[in-house]
């Protein structure tokens, strides 16, 4: 059975960075839910039209928290968890839950509210990841059964825009076959366009 990937949306707004990430997650997983969407938030049309994307105004606690059997099959990806995610977790869990935004720099403990709800936590290693990277790594571990430490990563890569302009990303990424960090389509252009802004302002 395919896995479900949920991001609990913890903001009143949805910036371009998050939109590109969420479109990528929906395309890659084919089963992506954005939960706790405020009724006042108008989602971008491209995101709503992306196959595999589901918008949910209810929080994950309301959807899964009432039934102990269902709740036990939900894994919270939590930087503070004691146990690392492992391939065996693909047998234990059907739903993987992420507290958006994982990609804050410096990291804020956005996951604490979900942690309080009692979901089982797993950690994705010591380095901060963007949300789409966290989902990608979770899929590699639980669906492809590749251990965390065997995944090729690029930590804090430098993006060169031209001879004079570059920026260093404060995150860990999965390394693509071309040797470059795997990022959402359009993300490098967004970063280049907004390179005068702080990374945190793009979310």
Map each language-model feature to its residues.
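Structured adenosyl-cofactor binding patch, chiefly the S-adenosyl-L-methionine
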Residues: 112-161
